Amino acid sequence: MAVTDIFARRATLARSVRLLSQFRYERSEPARFYGALAADTAAMVDDLWRAGHGESAAGRTLLDVGGGPGYFAAAFTDAGVRYLGVEPDPGEMHAAGPVVAADTGTFVRASGMALPFADDSVDICLSSNVAEHVPRPWQLGAEMLRVTRPGGLAVLSYTVWLGPFGGHEMGLTHYLGGARAAERYARKHGHPAKNNYGSSLFEVSVADGLAWAASTGAALAAFPRYHPRWAWSLTSVPVLREFLVSNLVLVLQPQ
């Protein structure tokens, strides 16, 4: 069984529409948006684990690189997974306030590019929408592989720069160029974007991600995170994939 076989059954058009419809609530109702994304991600990771290991990920240890304020912690804890979260920004770690229970995992303040964990120390290492926010995304990926036990899973998902969501809060102006989009945003709002091009937002392509994954010798699968199964073949079409694969998932297994 391929690692994506179980998840592929759930990757329907209805799921895609449901997830994408939540994006409009990212700023106005973050609990609604991130709660839905976290629940879907926990289910996706469990599907990937189940396909490769024949059992649920419940009871396994998962390290979430860039876990944020705790919505993912709650979703994985509810699924029976032992959750460890890494977040470099203390503001993000506490942003959820009282919505996250005290017993939903362990959190560490650290950089994803220098994880403070031993080699082969977790069963699953996840990074969701973080790689585009660090200057060296494949160093982050290498760290994820380092801490994942042989036979475990590293799941690296990131927003593709040339996709429709690549500019984050800058909207589609990123197609004018990152620096110009950042200038336009600052001029309009009177302050830089939270995801500011060149400091907290960087260009990451599908091609670069696929090339890096292939170079590790650990790649199992690559697919568009929010697309229905019948659209996954877009990942293999050069140029077009950069615009139509809005978020790429790389699944790797250290040996």
From Swiss-Prot:
| SUPFAM superfamilies in the cross-refs | S-adenosyl-L-methionine-dependent methyltransferases
Concerning CDD domains, the annotation shows: AdoMet_MTases (cd02440)
The domain of life is Bacteria
Question: Under which EC number(s) is this enzyme classified?
Answer: 2.1.1.-
What is any one GO biological process for this UniProt entry? Answer: methylation
Q: What is a single molecular function from GO for this protein?
A: S-adenosylmethionine-dependent methyltransferase activity
Question: Any keyword Cell cycle?
Answer: no
**Which key words are in the record?**
Methyltransferase, Transferase
**Which segments of the protein form a coiled coil according to its record?**
none
* Catalytic class of the enzyme: transferase
What Pfam families does this protein map onto?
A: Methyltransf_11
Q: State the family named in the UniProt similarity comment for this chain.
A: Belongs to the methyltransferase superfamily.
Q: Which PANTHER family match?
A: 2-METHOXY-6-POLYPRENYL-1,4-BENZOQUINOL METHYLASE, MITOCHONDRIAL, METHYLTRANSFERASE
Q: What is this protein called?
A: Uncharacterized methyltransferase MAP_3663c
| Source organism | Mycolicibacterium paratuberculosis (strain ATCC BAA-968 / K-10) (Mycobacterium paratuberculosis)
